[in-house]
Regions:
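Hydrophobic aliphatic residue packing
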Residues: 2, 11, 34, 67, ...
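A glycine/threonine-rich phosphate-anchoring loop and its flanking beta-alpha core
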Residues: 1-53
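Active-site segments that bind and position negatively charged phosphate/pyrophosphate groups
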Residues: 46, 50-159
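Conserved small/polar residues in nucleotide/adenosyl-binding loops
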Residues: 167-174
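Acidic, His/Gly-rich catalytic cores of divalent-metal-dependent hydrolytic chemistry
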Residues: 162-166
C-alpha cells in the first residue's frame, strides 16, 4: 500500500524502554514533546514546565500523562491534515534547520537536540519578525534548559548549514497551504 494513509488503531509504549535510556538520550526525546506543547497546547506546555523534575525522575504517572497528551496532540494534527496541506506543517517546527544541523554535525548531536536548536533559531526569527515577544522566546529557552538541551552549536560552518538547507528544504510550492 505505497502512498496510502492509515491512522494507527493503537499506540503502545512500554515504559520500561524509557527507563533503559541514558539520561542524554531520554532528554533528547523532549524536543518533540516540548514542541507539541508550543505548537498546540499552552496548558500542556505549562504542565511540562511545572512537572520537569517528576518527568526527569521517571515518575510513572507523569510519564504516562506526558505520553498520552503528546500522542493525542500528534494524532489530532495528523487526522485534521493527513496530506500535510496546512496544520500538519506545525509538526515540522524546528526540523528543517534541525536536520541540517544534524547532518553537518555528523550525528554527534541527537535528533531531539538538533530539533531544539532549529526551534531556537525559528523562535529568534519570530522575535525579529514580531510574531512572538522576546519574553515568549525566553520562556521557551528556559524550558529547553530545564530538559538540558544545548542552546548553541560549535564546530560547523553556517555556509555548510545553509547549503544543506538549500539542498533539502521544501520548495516554496511545498510550503504553500493553498494547494
Amino acid at each position: 500500500m505505497v502512498g496510502a494513509f492509515h491512522q494507527p488503531k493503537l499506540v503502545y509504549m512500554n515504559m520500561s524502554v524509557l527507563k533503559s535510556l541514558s539520561k542524554r538520550l531520554f532528554n533528547s526525546g523532549f524536543g518533540e514533546i516540548i514542541k507539541h506543547g508550543l505548537i498546540k497546547d499552552k496548558e500542556y506546555y505549562n504542565w511540562l514546565k511545572d512537572n520537569a523534575e517528576s518527568i526527569k525522575a521517571l515518575d510513572t504517572d507523569a510519564l504516562e500523562h506526558m505520553i498520552y497528551v503528546s500522542c493525542n496532540i500528534k494524532r489530532e494534527v495528523v487526522e485534521n491534515d493527513p496530506k500535510e496541506k496546512g496544520e500538519r506543517a506545525l509538526l515540522n517546527f524546528g526540523h528543517t534547520l534541525g536536520h541540517a544541523i544534524e547532518k553537518e554535525m555528523n550525528s554527534s548531536l541527537y535528533h531531539g537536540e538538533c530539533v531544539v536548536l532549529g526551534m531556537i533559531a525559528a523562535l529568534n526569527i519570530c522575535v525579529e519578525l514580531g510574531t512572538i515577544t522576546g519574553e515568549e522566546r525566553d520562556d521557551a529557552l528556559n524550558t529547553f534548559a530545564l530538559y538540558e538541551f544545548p542552546d548553541h552549536v560549535t564546530g560547523i560552518k553556517i555556509d555548510d548549514v545553509v547549503a544543506c538547507l538549500l539542498y533539502t528544504s521544501p520548495s516554496p510550492r511545498d510550503l504553500s497551504t493553498s494547494r
